Structure formats: C-alpha cells, structure tokens
C-alpha cells in the first residue's frame, strides 16, 4: 500500500511538472510572437546583420529587442531615410555638374580636370553615404507585399543599376575614357529615374 501511495505521488508530481513546463513554454511562445510582431518577416541582408533578432545591435546590447526600442528605431529609420533623400538630391545635382564639366573636358577644356576630379570624389562620397543610410536603416515594422510594379520596386531595381554604374564609373575614371563616360551616363540616367519614380 505504501509503495502504491509513493507511486501515485510520483505520477502526480510528473503531471504537475508537465503542466508547469507547458505553461512556461506558452509564455516563451508569446515572447516569440512579440518578436515576430516588432520585426518584419523579411529584411535585407544589411538590416538583418545589424537589426535582426540575432543582429549585432541585439547581441551587443546596443539596441535590445522590445516594443519601446523598436519605436525608437522607427524614429531613427525615419531620420535616416529623410537624410538619404536629401543627400540623394544633392548627389543628383553634383552628377549634373559632373556631366557638364565632363562634357567640356571631352571637348578639350582641360583646365577643368582637377575640379572634375575633386567634384567626382565629393559625388562618390555623397552617393555612398546616401546608399549607406538606406541600406543600414532599421527595418520597418512590416514589409508590405504589393503585387506588380510599384515605385518602391522600381526604385530598388534601378538602385542595382546605378550602384553598379557608380562603381564602374570610378573604376574606369583612369583606365578608359569612353567606358568611364558610358558608365557615368548610365549611372546618371538610372539614378535620376530612381528619384523620379518616387515623385510620380
């Protein structure tokens, strides 16, 4: 009888322990759903590395994942993307000036070479600063999937072209004048179009 009572107590303890474990698991599942609510399902690689669930800022404790912290991150995102936009306009103006000077250089006005070179360095720096602000900004709460072509998709596709073009323009600046010119025109056209698609 005593052995039966001991066995019954042991079984009862096992049942209580399982219920307690199930309750704790439920709590952790709720925490996971909070993480899923504050981070989008998909992020670009650069955002994931910094701002993802296991990103650098989470691991180092710079930006712990919570609803309050995500609200702060969204404010940072807003500032970064507005700055990206302003730098984008300045870069476009610099590209126009570069195109004018470049055309004069091709027509034999070599006194503009140093100015063109210096302006090219400034345009390159502003371009990659603006790109960095976009690529490293905290992710949005939700990434909306929109079927078909829209201004955001067009802006991103054009970014592949002008990003590659900017690298090619700089790579060919001393190597091949013709390819430098073609890369610069391609970069300018795709960059200007990427800005215009957001306006219309």
Residue ranges of predicted features:
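N-terminal targeting leaders of membrane proteins
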Residues: 15-114, 133-147
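Hydrophobic alpha-helical membrane-anchor/signal-helix detector
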Residues: 77-106, 115-138, 153-174, 180-200
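Generic intrinsically disordered, low-complexity segments enriched for polar/acidic and small residues
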Residues: 2-3, 9, 25, 42, ...
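Low-complexity, compositionally biased segments
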Residues: 6-7, 24, 33, 119, ...
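Bacterial Sec-dependent N-terminal signal peptides
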Residues: 1-19
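Juxtamembrane helix-capping/reentrant segments at transmembrane boundaries
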Residues: 146-154
């Amino acid at each position: 009888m005593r052995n039966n009572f001991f066995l019954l107590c042991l079984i009862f303890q096992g049942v209580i322990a399982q219920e307690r474990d199930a309750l704790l698991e439920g709590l952790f599942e709720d925490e996971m759903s909070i993480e899923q609510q504050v981070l989008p399902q998909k992020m670009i690689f650069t955002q994931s590395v910094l701002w993802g669930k296991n990103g650098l800022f989470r691991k180092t404790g710079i930006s712990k994942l919570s609803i309050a912290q995500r609200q702060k991150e969204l404010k940072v995102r807003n500032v970064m993307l507005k700055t990206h936009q302003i730098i984008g306009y300045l870069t476009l103006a610099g590209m126009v000036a570069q195109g004018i000077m470049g055309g004069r250089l091709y027509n034999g006005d070599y006194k503009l070479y140093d100015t063109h070179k210096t302006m090219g360095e400034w345009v390159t720096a502003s371009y990659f600063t603006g790109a960095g602000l976009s690529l490293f900004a905290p992710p949005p709460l939700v990434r909306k999937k929109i079927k078909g072509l829209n201004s955001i998709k067009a802006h991103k596709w054009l970014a592949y072209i002008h990003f590659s073009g900017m690298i090619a323009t700089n790579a060919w600046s001393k190597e091949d004048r013709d390819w430098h010119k073609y890369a610069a025109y391609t970069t300018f056209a795709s960059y200007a179009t990427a800005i215009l698609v957001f306006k219309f």
